[in-house]
Curated annotation (Swiss-Prot):
Family (UniProt): Belongs to the PanB family.
Cofactor(s) the record lists: Mg(2+)
Lineage, broadest ranks: Bacteria, Pseudomonadati, Pseudomonadota, Alphaproteobacteria, Hyphomicrobiales
Organism of this sequence: Nitrobacter hamburgensis (strain DSM 10229 / NCIMB 13809 / X14)
Residues annotated as the enzyme's active site: E187 (proton acceptor)
Name the UniProt record assigns to this protein: 3-methyl-2-oxobutanoate hydroxymethyltransferase
Residue numbers binding Mg(2+): D49, D88, E120
Amino acid sequence: MSVQSAIRRRTAPDIRARKNGDPIVMLTSYHAHTAALVDRHCDVILVGDSLGNVMHGFETTVPVTLDMMILQGRAVMRGSQQALVVVDMPFGSYEASKEQAFHSAARILKETLCGAVKLEGGVKMAETIAFLTARGVPVMGHVGLTPQSINTLGSFRAQGREEGTWRPIEDDARAVAEAGAFSMVIEAVAEPLARKITESVAIPTIGIGASPACDGQVLVLEDMLGLSPRAPKFVRRYGELGPMIEAAIEGYARDVRSRAFPGPEHVYAMKPKAS
């Protein structure tokens, strides 16, 4: 048995069992090489539709397609060995009907070999979540700020910060949990509300701009590494790789223009003639 085949990959039930346990660590990844790095330290790798912003320069996640998610999901699966890989269902791939959602989710699971899918929405998506889970599709929910709804929300603003706005978000979280999701992301929600939801639902909550009381946390990798020019309020920068990468590129360009690169150690000499 190879070393790789001996490593057990985490599953949705493993994450479900972490409710009120050790905090769940989740980061995004879209490439095999970053997945290999994230895999060593994280419980879950999210192949997020944020790849539309990070990789393709879209202003929102709305233009992301199912084929784009599958392509990057396959890359992340090849680069990782032990983390649960969750792939986002992009806008337009699941909202029309339960059947559409199952067809899209089945493609993701079959073509990437990932362990779960994630979809946005609460009460309105509960029936779809139940339909998927009943047919063998592990689902991670997503409530609070739902970026795919930007055209109806109008802006990426935190939710639940005004009096009288908690009830719909609580209803969404409860509906997701009762529908059979194994966990849920809570994004950009007032801290006391995120804490209350975490205490009230039976499945793990994973916060992003929510509360330290959540059962886990997630960030976009490029945000926390300092590769994004701007980052949301809820991001802590654990590195500033942007300036480091630019300095390396500047050095390369300088050496090429001055003919300092390639040096003798970077080129191939002729083989000696056979005697």
